[in-house]
Amino acid sequence: MAYRKRGARRETNLKQDDRMQEKEENKSTNSVIENKNGTKTQLSEKVLSQKEEVITDNQEETRIADEVKKSNKEESKQLLEVLKTKEEHQKEVQYEILQKTIPTFEPKESILKKLEDIKPEQAKKQTKLFRIFEPKQLPIYRANGEKELRNRWYWKLKRDTLPDGDYDVREYFLNLYDQVLTEMPDYLLLKDMAVENKNSRDAGKVVDSETAAICDAIFQDEETEGVVRRFIAEMRQRVQADQNVVNYPSILHPIDHAFNEYFLQHQLVEPLNNDIIFNYIPERIRNDVNYILNMDRNLPSTARYIRPNLLQDRLNLHDNFESLWDTITTSNYILARSVVPDLKELVSTEAQIQKMSQDLQLEALTIQSETQFLTGINSQAANDCFKTLIAAMLSQRTMSLDFVTTNYMSLISGMWLLTVIPNDMFIRESLVACQLAIINTIIYPAFGMQRMHYRNGDPQTPFQIAEQQIQNFQVANWLHFVNNNQFRQVIIDGVLNQVLNDNIRNGHVVNQLMEALMQLSRQQFPTMPVDYKRSIQRGILLLSNRLGQLVDLTRLLAYNYETLMACITMNMQHVQTLTTEKLQLTSVTSLCMLIGNATVIPSPQTLFHYYNVNVNFHSNYNERINDAVAIITAANRLNLYQKKMKSIVEDFLKRLQIFDVSRVPDDQMYRLRDRLRLLPVEIRRLDIFNLILMNMEQIERASDKIAQGVIIAYRDMQLERDEMYGYVNIARNLDGFQQINLEELMRTGDYAQITNMLLNNQPVALVGALPFITDSSVISLIAKLDATVFAQIVKLRKVDTLKPILYKINSDSNDFYLVANYDWVPTSTTKVYKQVPQQFDFRASMHMLTSNLTFTVYSDLLAFVSADTVEPINAVAFDNMRIMNEL
């Protein structure tokens, strides 16, 4: 029986105590009694509990109740763990959502490799002329559909591919234009691509391997006239050595000839001499006395180079493109870290920690706050901090600070950091947290002031508020400097540079910091215990003992930053980045405490490498902008504007190499499109598009997949004989047919005219470029004639889905052989209007192309410069004093 027990709690407690005493006296009690005692011990723990306990005399029930409670506890623990895991997972999900809005998340090595792999375009050697057309031999068919033994040469497209979609033919021309832009050479040297003419009498050469192959095929064709063979045998180059000019014979379609002639007339190569190379080196490095630059040879008169395209800020990616800007700054940061020199001859970590321990008199102390001063100090952290600071400034990448408020040494080191690095380099929340910690831990307690209660969202930073409240001149003066520590924007050699304050560059600001720290250490800390005051004073003492080294460190930091900054070619726009580089204040302490006397400056080879990578990326960036602007203009003029725009912008970003395009948010894609639309088209690219536009009909004729129109009728129309195909549903002219323009029809959407004519049994010719599907099976063709063509026109009234069908009936068909005595005449309710491609005429296709006989294009201009440095220990800063004075 179970009953409620309210009044006898004290009695139970006494009995419990007696039994516990008995247990202590007699340790040989049997296990049953021990079990009972164990159960009652649990009860004694709950004596003072306010909850009512249900006591039962049934041992089994007690055990079950205990197990239930135990399982409940375990369940609640598991629930807590699940909730905790869920919370952590939620944070990870939120972080992942943020990550997805930033286009690059790849290992650092791969980003660096992508940047270094961007080479100038002229490194691609042209081995062939640009061609859209090639001559092909096609059989001739007799009136009865049998193939003759004779062949005829026609100009056909080399790459006859049509993409899927409603605007197939227009997309074909857009893709063709993109292909031309990709293959458009910056220069052509015909001598490099010339090959031997096998049929030449005197080992002459023709312009490229394709010309040689065409000549060979024509020479071997039995129907070729003797005069043409003799002409091929005479084909060879003509050299005018005194003018450095050579003429090569070529076989080209007139349109291809126009393209290649344009490329030859508009080459981007310029003469190269020593002056150009020397002026190519950034002026600040040329004038830096620490670097000795020398050229030990003259360049020949045939030397050429392609001027890099270094236009600035055409898209302003720093403005309202947070994800794209984050990716660019990340890749710049990774590149910059790879070129910042490693610190040398740092103070031994062990020796420094031992010295700091002596200064702190740690053996005699009982408090532990000062032992924290020594945590995390190591040379790796010092070197990492040095690289992070310089690389973040070079890439204008925002940093966030990580620190522990109770580690006063970290906060004092943070005061040096905030003195030498402009405020803009830190994410605002992190900067506020660090400044607030310094004020409430060091500055306000020193003067006995109340803690600062900072309101989140206050436009002023804690240091700005403190500057108005602190009466001490030195401390207020230092706060004023930190509050106004901003980059100066200076345009040097046409590039916007973010320059440090002169007081930081020469290290004088460290003396200002030390004066403020000395004032703080002399204060009484009236509201704090003596131990607290002593800890702060000893932390300040540790830093002030390193005054000379800190001045040197500041000068070294500024010198390396400015020297590497001279190699940056894109404007250094400063915008806070979405992601940040974490900086531990303990690593700043490591840097302050372990910096030695050894000067480190970038090697000339490192500078040249950094400069080359920056130039190549910047030039590629501008060229890809030119391509994208040209394609957008072409899409607009081909009425593909709405459909193709996003893919054009995606292609543009892919070609910049560093972006993971699938992660770029759509809003930034369309904003990028709007910026690209405003830019003018580069003249070469515009001329090339106009060439394509003027010759669209010739290109359509040469295609086997593009028709110039379609004829539709209710009544059957007989197949006509065509000498190129045999019997086909092809019309070579539109005489006698009522014509309607397809483009106009799609624009107006008025199909009444077509349906009326068809219902009156009048064939209609819809004229305009559209693709057709070739099908040589007669049975499958007849089965789908009416359904595919007429139904779509009359019922769906959608001309843009029209697919005209070309089919052939000739002696080569798989399932049908047409002979003269067949009574059945094949018919069709649709005909394809297709103009005859241009016949290949050898005389009209032979062109002489002219180029320089020889010149050499150099892509790496700095390879000619031999460079060395003075002994780093003698290296001087901008003020003509040694960078490191504390020797």
UniProtKB/Swiss-Prot annotation:
Cellular component, GO, one term: T=2 icosahedral viral capsid
Compartments it resides in: Virion
Comp. bias intervals (Basic and acidic residues): 9-27
Segments for region (5-fold hub): 1-87
Region of interest called Disordered, as start-end residue ranges on this chain: 1-43
Location of the region described as Hydrophobic in the Swiss-Prot/TrEMBL record: 401-421, 429-449
Keywords: Capsid protein, Inner capsid protein, Repeat, RNA-binding, T=2 icosahedral capsid protein, Ubl conjugation, Virion
Presence of keyword Mitochondrion: no
Coiled-coil stretches noted in the UniProt entry, renumbered to this chain: none
Family under the similarity heading: Belongs to the rotavirus VP2 family.
Assembly description: Homodecamer; each decamer is made up of two conformers of VP2, called VP2A and VP2B. Interacts with a VP1-VP3 complex. Interacts with the intermediate capsid protein VP6. Interacts with NSP5. Interacts (via N-terminus) with NSP2.
Chain's role: Inner capsid protein that self-assembles to form an icosahedral capsid with a T=2 symmetry, which consists of 120 copies of VP2, with channels at each of its five-fold vertices. This capsid constitutes the innermost concentric layer of the viral mature particle. It encapsidates the polymerase VP1, the capping enzyme VP3 and the genomic dsRNA, thereby defining the core.
Name of the featured protein: Inner capsid protein VP2
